[in-house]
Amino acid sequence: MPALSVPSGARSRRALRGLAAATALAVVPALGVATTATAQQGHRSTISQSSHDRQLAPRTHFTMQADGSSGLTAGGEGIPNIDSVKKTIATYYGDPGTGIADKASSPYISEMAATLEDQKTYLKTAYNHAVRQGEKPALVFDADDTTLWTYDMEVADMHFNFDPARQDVWVQEQRFPATPGMVSFVNTAAAMGFTVFGLTGRNDNQKAATVANLAKVGYTAFPEDRFYTKWTGVGSSQQPAYITCAAAKCTTVEYKAGTRKHIEDLGYDIVLNVGDQWSDLQGGYADRILKLPNPTYYLPSPDLPGLSEPRLAPRTHFTMKPDGSSGLTVSGEAIPNIDSVKKTIATYYGDPGTGISNKSASPYISEMSALVEKQQKRVVQACATGARQGTKPAIVLDADDTTLWTYDMEVADMHFNFNPAEQDVWVKDERFPATPSMVGLADAAATAGCTIVGLTGRNDNQREATLGNLAKVGYTGFTEANYYTKWTGVGSSQQPAYITCAAAKCTTIEYKSQTRRHVESAAGGGYDIVANFGDQFSDLKGGYADHAVKLPNPTYYLP
């Protein structure tokens, strides 16, 4: 869907009235289990890459409410993975991975150009109509990601974690480039005869720098007396008399709609109101609105009391490939907004906003409990059967988010931006709690006759601490001999002879699948891997297990 442009009603002085609409919330089923082909003679647990690995892939269709509430019902696989969302956003903005948007060519720039081109005919018609009616036609523009482009700040500097102190540095130093296509659009409209107003959530202390930044990048139509910023409550910067709010603190919609009403009370007709957030556009007092694409943050606000505008809301259905390539073809509105994804993940883990998951009750814990209960019966039966038949049954368990739970590190500490040095601190300090229900599964498998094998992407220097952490939280079946960590390439920690890779650096699948093959070989113990558990599809691909069990994890993606 392209950027949205809709009429705001028969007359801009009337607040918008939308049609009531009910949006059905899709409940995504809990995770399934990928089951391998029957063991073949000579390769007891080897699976067919072509037939089975194709099933081991992330979901591509999602239903997500913007407020995060889908985390209550969607299941972990039904939540857009945040790493895939980041890659999709980067692709859309032409960001090669540096956090810097391409300023010359990108899907975002192309969409902006097409969106603004579509408005030109409307502006000419609307201007001529207003003049014939003896009105003073005006346009209203938001600042951030409407006239000034914040991507480089949001991503390269803040890594999708907004910091008001850092933002103020960018504002005061006037660092922002113009939003693509907007300088020409605004200046052309001003030359046509429109009066141009700015209306932003930036505060009064940032007004002078913002107006200067706009002029610096080429805008000619934003004088300070037509540029509205929000009061700070300090000194002379107080709430204007023309704005009244239902509570002591005004909502964004109350502030912006009230300011637009004030502009119209001055005798102007707001022909078009342009913003990148729905809260820029709600509340009426404009003949038409234009929603610009922005999946990099979400600033919701309650609408005006008694006003319903169901059309002015984010989309809820998304198609997204895990590798980020969807950013080449979908519109900005069709990319899951990263702030909504974060809220959905937080809801799923019972995180109240602190970055700390609920350790007692959450949708994640419930899903893990149901999944493990189902799989434990299958695993215990396979272990018992193998033990009776003398086939040396074993289960393989990944570490992070399979046996040890990393959410608090990933969110409270790293804010969804992985830091290997900080991760090493958590590992060496043995800080991780157990992944819900997994201690019981491992114990039941061991009691039924299975050997417990650990296989992780953590390195050899982290093996001792990882085994210590596992024992600390209640696991009893892991041993040094059957716990596989990745080589560092330093000293005696070298690539094992039983692993060969297509390139100098092994992929996760090469490392893990060939380690499982080794475990099933005579040299590795001659085990029959009856089940392989992991939270990443790369933990499971490549065969050498009778069953592969994918655990939910929307907090990172390791292809």
Model segments located where?
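Non-catalytic pre-domain segments flanking phosphatase-related domains
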Residues: P2-F141, P305-L397
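Soluble non-cytosolic domains of exported or imported proteins
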Residues: I79, D83, D102, S106-E117, ...
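Surface-exposed patches in mature extracellular/periplasmic domains of secreted proteins
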Residues: Y127-A138, F194-R202, E224-R226, V271-N273, ...
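A solvent-exposed, charged loop/short amphipathic helix patch at secondary-structure junctions
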Residues: V155-E173, V411-D429
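Short, acidic loop-to-helix structural element flanking the phosphoryl-transfer center
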Residues: Q167-F197, Q206, T210, Q423-V453, ...
